[in-house]
Amino acid sequence: MTRRRLRFGNGLDLELALGDDAPAGAEVLVVPQDVNLIMGEVTVIEETGETPGEAVAAATAASTPRAQGSVVVGPRRPGLPLVFQAVVYDFQRSPPTCEEHVFAALLTALEEARTRGVRCLGVQPVGTAHGGLSAERFLNVLSQVCYSAAELGTSVRRVYVLLASAEELGRYETLLSEAMSERRLAP
């Protein structure tokens, strides 16, 4: 269910949608992730005698942290959108994210989508939890990325911002309406 739309250039639309899952037709889902790749679902990599907690701890200790602002592309799952994990959090820092890392991750995600010929993607509000960006800053950063993608040329035609609650949807609708009004007033 979408309620508001902001158009960039001649064909990239930013829309608000209610729900955490990508809407029908979305080929990619962009989700938040931390540098150690421990947020979200943990899948079984191999069978061991360790408990799940021990296995995760061992895998985390053995892996190299990812750079903030990067994107990790998940494995293909039949019938589901491809998952792009936007690495925006580092819980060893305070605050754990910043606008620069969110911008870099979103820009990388849209560029990766372009190289894959993706036309539609869903984006969870990455970087807005854990004392990160405000909804207004996130929407501003995403708008900048969409504008850049539209100006430089992209296969992406629709970006859905996936909002978890009706309250959050209402807040983003207000912010998007204000942004649309400001665009009309700009010279």
Regions found by a protein language model. Give the residues of each.
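Phosphate/ribose-phosphate-bearing ligand recognition and processing surfaces
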Residues: 90-187
